[in-house]
């Protein structure tokens, strides 16, 4: 899974309820503790910038447990891993930006607890930091294997810059890479590694790769794409353990009665939202930190955005938790607007992307919402769009090397269309708007 991969979806299928957003706090500026942001991912970086763009002049503090300023995660499994993108270009903004905007960016700072009554954040070093408003942007962490040999050297997970630096270094000498998990993150890494000349195997326990996030037709397309580049894609294959060398390095991946040689393993089997701080503080959680349509939690002064939040989507008509950069960025803007006294609702059509080899896949909505598929373009030429309709209206698209179709679908989302015209490449999609 693009897990950020660029995205994954977890839905609780609960109806959207209307909620009230309380008015912004009113107190003298000299008495204001300011706004604290826990987490230093892309959403957190956007939030800090948005607060200054909103004209907020109080203290803004970002607390991040990594050694880096806010950065983009999507390139990690693609251009950064391949070496095509330098570290500085992974950063959301140059480090100088935060000082220039009087934003207190604290890296290597892990938060130990929250006290929503006292309105303080306590770091692992024991420092108490007061806040008027708090944003939780703690993201997620990789789900880990707990099986025989899973602690051997050479078994990696991909989530952070440090993770990718370790993988990139290992790839310099590795010959046989096994990727456990056939989601977007795993497939993106497979494309980088295969291009670099490694022998690559992808192991997926489900019937097909990408089973949780797309249709059988798209799974088959990407299966063929990877096998055509020499990747050994094995579905219906679960991992039972790992065996190692005498010095504790991984040597084989065990799959029941069979084994696969490996001197490097990357595991991508999903993520776990980082909600423990909120849970322990008594904030409502259910498959994420529960927020309303203003990105506000059950505590009036605490907001949550990104991977860790479970939000209502009025367009889809249900609650869901998204692992998606566009979602985190837009939620950051909405939450900050509301923190600053506006009344702004988060209502966006989800969209995602994945880069594999020379193909860019761009997605709008969820294919599982459709009851009809309409193909436009030529799959054999690696340039097509698969539209998904429900009761004649567009609810999703998977666009491969078809940016125009992707952009048009954003505008056509939810609208009734003529399926025959949609499928005809001679028909200008703008005529359907």
Model-inferred region functions:
Residues 30-34, 53, 308-407:
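Mid-to-C-terminal Rossmann-like scaffold of FAD/NAD(P)H-dependent oxidoreductases
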Residues 138-196:
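Glycine-rich dinucleotide-binding loop and its adjacent helix/turn
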Residues 151-173, 244-334:
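FAD-site-proximal beta/loop scaffold in flavoenzymes
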